[in-house]
Amino acid sequence: ALHTPFGISGGAQAMANNVLVTLELNGGFIGYGEAAPLPPYNGETQAQAMTVLAAAQAWLVGKPADDWRALATEFRTRGGAACGSAQCAFEMALLDAVNRRDGVPMWKYFGGAGTALETDMTVTTGSPEQAATDARAIRDRRIRMIKVKVGGPKGPGYDLARLVAIHGVAPDSPLILDGNAGVSRADATALVQGLR
C-alpha cells in the first residue's frame, strides 16, 4: 500500500500493483526491472504487464544480450508496445543485467559525468491543506523540485489554491505542473493566467 493515495486527474490509486522482473544472462548475471502500471493514467494493469512479460520468455531465451536496442525493439513488436510499463521493466532488467556482467554502472554506460542526479517528488491531487502538508514533507526530505498534479473536475481555481498553499511552505522550490492529459486548453490557459 502507498503512504497516501496517488491521485491524478483521471483518478487515484491507493495500492501500487507493480511487477518485479528478473532477467538472467548466461553466466548467472541477474538484472532487475520494475513495471509500474497505473490504471487511472493509461489503463494498464498488473495482469496485463505480467502477460506481456511472460510472453517474451518464449522467444527471448538464447538471444544475445549485447544488442539491447534490438531486443527492446523486438519486445515492442512482439506485443510489448501494448504495455509501456512492461516494456520499461524489460529494458531496465536487460540493461541492469548487461551492466552487472560488464562491471559498468548504468550512469557510466550512458556517458554520465557524475553520480548525482536531481529529481522531483509529486504532490498528488487533493485539498490545498493536503498539498501544503505533502510539500512540507518533500522539503523535509531535502528534495528541492516539486511536481504538482493538476486538472480534474474542481477546475483551475482549485489548482491555483493548491499551488499557493505549496508556495507558502516551499517558496524556493521550482514547481512542475503535470496535468496528465486531464487539463483542457481553456483550463490550462486559465491556470497559466492565474499564475501571473
List the predicted regions and their residue ranges.
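Glycine-rich anion/phosphate-binding loops
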Residues: 13, 83-91, 127-132
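Short beta-strand scaffold segments in enzyme catalytic cores
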Residues: 19-23
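Metal-dependent enolase-superfamily TIM-barrel catalytic cores that perform enediolate-based chemistry
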Residues: 108-196
